[in-house]
């Protein structure tokens, strides 16, 4: 586990595209997934990682020259979230590595790092993505009643967990 740097932008962009296509094949319209361009994703990630806000973190898991998964975290921008809440904005794993425990390890690290700075940690996922719901529930995150329409035409739900005392 390590903090991502600008040199990881290309690998994260390519992984994000593969992960979305695998994870959301039954959730999002095919044209949405087909429109994802790994080159554009890589450029966006390079830009973001080159000027990473001090409040944000991007964690990667894998050997030094590879990215098997990544998690992006930062403050939770939701007006209805508890004041000062943190959020895991994204968690993606190489599709072939799902079920190996790497996702749990990566998510646990990202959530624990957020809990150093935030009393409550939130995560959003597509409501139709039952696997994600079970994953977050096993990690102690419960539905908190918040939902919203996504820009992709499907509903997202929020889960949250309060830092242990």
Predicted segments, located by residue:
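Short amphipathic helical patch at the helix-1/turn junction of helix-turn-helix
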Residues: 93, 126-127
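Conserved GNAT acetyl-CoA-binding A-motif
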Residues: 114-125
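Conserved active-site alpha-helix within GNAT-family acetyltransferase domains
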Residues: 100, 104, 128-145, 152-153
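Hydrophobic beta-strand residues of extracellular immunoglobulin-like
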Residues: 57-60, 122, 157
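Structural motif
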Residues: 15, 116, 138-139
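Terminal substrate-recognition subdomain of acyl/acetyltransferases
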Residues: 155-165
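Acetyl-CoA-dependent GNAT
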Residues: 3-9, 14-96, 104-109, 113, ...
């Amino acid at each position: 586990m390590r903090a991502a740097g600008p040199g990881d932008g290309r690998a994260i962009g390519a992984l994000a595209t593969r992960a979305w296509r695998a994870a959301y094949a039954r959730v999002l319209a095919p044209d949405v997934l087909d429109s994802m361009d790994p080159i554009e994703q890589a450029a966006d990630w390079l830009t973001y990682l080159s000027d990473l806000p001090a409040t944000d973190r991007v964690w990667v898991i894998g050997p030094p020259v590879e990215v098997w998964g990544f998690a992006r975290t930062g403050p939770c921008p939701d007006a209805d979230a508890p004041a000062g809440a943190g959020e895991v904005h994204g968690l993606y794993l190489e599709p072939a590595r799902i079920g190996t425990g790497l996702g749990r390890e990566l998510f646990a690290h990202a959530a624990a790092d957020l809990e150093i700075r935030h009393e409550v940690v939130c995560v959003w996922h597509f409501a139709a993505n039952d696997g994600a719901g079970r994953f977050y529930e096993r990690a102690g995150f419960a539905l908190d009643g918040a939902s919203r329409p996504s820009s992709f035409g499907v509903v997202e739900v929020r889960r949250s967990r309060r830092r242990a005392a």
